[in-house]
């Protein structure tokens, strides 16, 4: 078999040498092989951060990799273009061997028609306009090579004047929305004097949308406001208006508050619900005599509260925290107006949660060997119980055992064949909360916070200054309790 491969590669080498390792012999008439780009020339480009960012984007837009590109570069090529040589040597053949060689080892040439510099310059000009260079232009030139069948490209970019934002006004919004925009003006993504940049303006529109949706505007969407730009009044600058559309559903112009929060707990997707447990903040619906999950656990994970304004960020956090418990196979939040009148401004929240399978079981088997001549098997078994005590806990059991014996002769003949063994077990309980000693109950902590606020009011201080900032966790805090034992008996 080795001799066959050597013969095959020797035959390929002879063919390549006989054809002179040509990279253009099979190029069709009227076509030229694209051999890369010369570095792009940037005319009148400044060194600002914005201009540097635009240049980096243009380098990507204008780039076309030639055959044998080094590290994906459009300007550097490897001197050994074996795939291209094989394609030129065998692509015009009609035998099965020729077709196999082209398919297995050949690389199709990159032609000038594929490089298509006209298309790249058009895309580049559009990019310049989107990034504020309205007068920018891009041209290219063909750079002939010694072989008339080969051609290089070189682009020239004239960026021109950078247009900036003269004013950015928010037009047509309601007084409540205007107040929100003014209160968060320091968070704006762009402002007067900044470069005119479509991507930055789009980020600002997205920020306004998120701001509204975090402050009760449940039905507001990004497409309900659009930009109007005036680049004529003051040359070199653009007056921009973010304007609310005229025909908008009235529900998007008022704030919505949370009323009832309903949680549907199912062990399977189509399980029927026949029991409801009412609480101060939650209504839990389930099947059976008692809830499969304690109310306190749900209250900790659901950050939307009765009487609060709707918040898209809290909705997303609630969804993430429910998923992070590890006890649900799927969760879904939905919001329903309490009635269909035009004055309605309250939403009922429905959280549909389907429990994952209650048990997981695994078994692992290994075979071990040591340089001392000892060999033997090892077995590990584990069982996990989800929601073990109706508090979202994960209860894990794990047992392991291993046995080994000595094979062959050893210096101590009496120990040859004698066995060693090991066995043990582990129990762990993972709680979806932090256990902090001496912290006190939630009722005690709330009472302590209430007294601090009352004392601040008595001193004439702003109560907001003594309120502690709410902790934000990117994952549900976990406490793990673990106990394990192991017995090892080793014999020399």
Per-region residue spans from a language model:
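C-terminal motif of bacterial Sec signal peptides marking the signal peptidase cleavage site
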Residues: 17-20
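Gram-negative/organellar outer-membrane beta-barrel architecture
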Residues: 180, 291-292, 311-492
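Bacterial N-terminal signal peptides that target proteins for export
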Residues: 1-8
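Interaction-mediating elements
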Residues: 22-324, 333
């Amino acid at each position: 078999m080795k001799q066959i491969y050597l013969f095959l590669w020797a035959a390929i080498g002879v063919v390549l040498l006989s054809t002179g390792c040509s990279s253009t012999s099979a190029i069709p008439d009227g076509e030229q092989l694209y051999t890369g780009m010369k570095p792009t020339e940037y005319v009148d480009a400044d060194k600002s951060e914005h201009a540097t960012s635009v240049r980096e984007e243009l380098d990507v837009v204008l780039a076309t990799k030639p055959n044998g590109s080094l590290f994906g570069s459009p300007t550097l090529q490897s001197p050994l273009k074996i795939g291209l040589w094989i394609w030129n040597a065998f692509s015009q053949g009609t035998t099965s061997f020729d077709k196999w060689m082209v398919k297995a080892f050949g690389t199709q040439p990159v032609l000038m028609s594929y490089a298509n510099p006209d298309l790249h310059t058009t895309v580049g000009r559009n990019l310049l306009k989107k990034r504020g260079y309205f007068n920018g232009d891009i041209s290219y030139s063909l750079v002939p090579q010694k072989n008339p069948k080969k051609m290089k490209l070189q682009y020239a970019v004239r960026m021109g004047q950078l247009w900036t934002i003269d004013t950015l006004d928010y037009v047509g919004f309601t007084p409540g929305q205007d107040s929100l925009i003014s209160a968060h003006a320091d968070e704006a993504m762009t402002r007067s004097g900044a470069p005119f940049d479509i991507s930055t303006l789009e980020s600002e529109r997205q920020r306004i949308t998120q701001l509204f949706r975090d402050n009760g505007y449940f039905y507001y969407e990004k497409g309900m406001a659009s930009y109007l730009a005036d680049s004529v009044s003051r040359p070199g600058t653009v007056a921009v208006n973010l304007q609310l559309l005229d025909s908008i559903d009235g529900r998007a112009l008022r704030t919505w508050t949370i009323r009832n929060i309903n949680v549907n707990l199912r062990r399977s997707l189509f399980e029927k619900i026949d029991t409801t447990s009412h609480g101060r903040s939650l209504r839990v619906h389930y099947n059976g005599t008692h809830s499969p999950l304690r109310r306190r656990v749900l209250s900790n994970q659901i950050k939307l509260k009765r009487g609060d304004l709707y918040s898209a960020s809290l909705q997303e956090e609630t969804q993430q925290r429910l998923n992070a418990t590890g006890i649900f196979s799927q969760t879904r939040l939905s919001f329903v107006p309490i009635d269909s009148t035009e004055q309605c401004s309250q939403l009922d929240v429905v959280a549909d949660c389907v429990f994952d399978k209650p048990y997981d079981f695994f078994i692992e088997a290994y075979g071990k060997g040591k340089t001392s001549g000892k060999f033997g098997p090892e077995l590990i078994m584990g069982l996990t119980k989800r929601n073990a005590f109706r508090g979202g806990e994960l209860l894990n059991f794990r047992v392991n055992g291993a046995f080994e014996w000595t094979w062959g002769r050893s210096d101590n003949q009496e120990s040859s064949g004698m066995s060693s063994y090991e066995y043990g077990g582990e129990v762990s309980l993972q709680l979806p909360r932090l256990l902090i000693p001496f912290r006190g109950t939630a009722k005690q902590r709330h009472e302590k916070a209430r007294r601090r606020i009352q004392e601040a009011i008595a001193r004439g201080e702003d109560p907001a200054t003594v309120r502690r900032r709410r902790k934000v966790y990117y994952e549900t805090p976990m406490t793990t309790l673990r106990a394990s034992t192991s017995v090892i008996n080793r014999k020399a």
